From Swiss-Prot:
The gene is crr. Residues 34-138 form the PTS EIIA type-1 domain. SUPFAM superfamilies: Duplicated hybrid motif. Gene3D superfamilies: Glucose Permease (Domain IIA). This is PTS system glucose-specific EIIA component. It comes from the Bacteria. GO terms for cellular component: cytoplasm. Zn(2+) binds at residues 71, 86.
Amino acid sequence: MFKKLFGKAKEVDKNIKIYAPLTGEYVKIEDIPDPVFAQKMMGEGFGINPTEGEVVSPIEGKVDNVFPTKHAVGLKAENGLELLVHIGLDTVQLDGKGFEVLVESGDDIKIGDPLIRFDLEYINNNAKSIISPIIITNSDQTESIHIEDVQAVVKGETQVIDVTVS
C-alpha cells in the first residue's frame, strides 16, 4: 500500500526530438531576418521558410499558450521543454487576419497534429517575412541541443533537433 502512495513517480524521458512544424526550407537561426530571434535572445532554435500554410505539432505534449493574434503558439513537452512556433515576422501586427487556430490552451497534442492554418500568400504580402522561427524558450534548461543537417523539411516528418533536458 505504501509503495502505491509513495512509490517513484513515472520516469520522464529527458531526450526529445523536435520535428518540423511546417513544410518548407530550413533556415539557420542566425539567418532569421530579426535580431531578437537571430541573436537567440528568446532561445535556441531554427526557422522555416514555409511552402504551405499549415502548422503541425513538432512535439508530443500540451498546448501551453495560443496567442490572441493567432500568429504563434506555445507548446510544452512532458519533460518540461517549452517551444514557441511563430509564423512569420512582425505578424502580430496582422491582428489575427490570415490565421485560423485549430487548438486551445490545455489541448493534448501529438507530433503532426494540426495547430494553425494560415494564408501563405496574405502573410507573405503583409508581413516583414514569412520565415517562421521555432524556438526552445527554455533552452537554458537543456543539457544538449543537436541540430540536424537538413535543408528541405516536411511538417511532422523531418526531425530537426534532438534535445536533452536537464
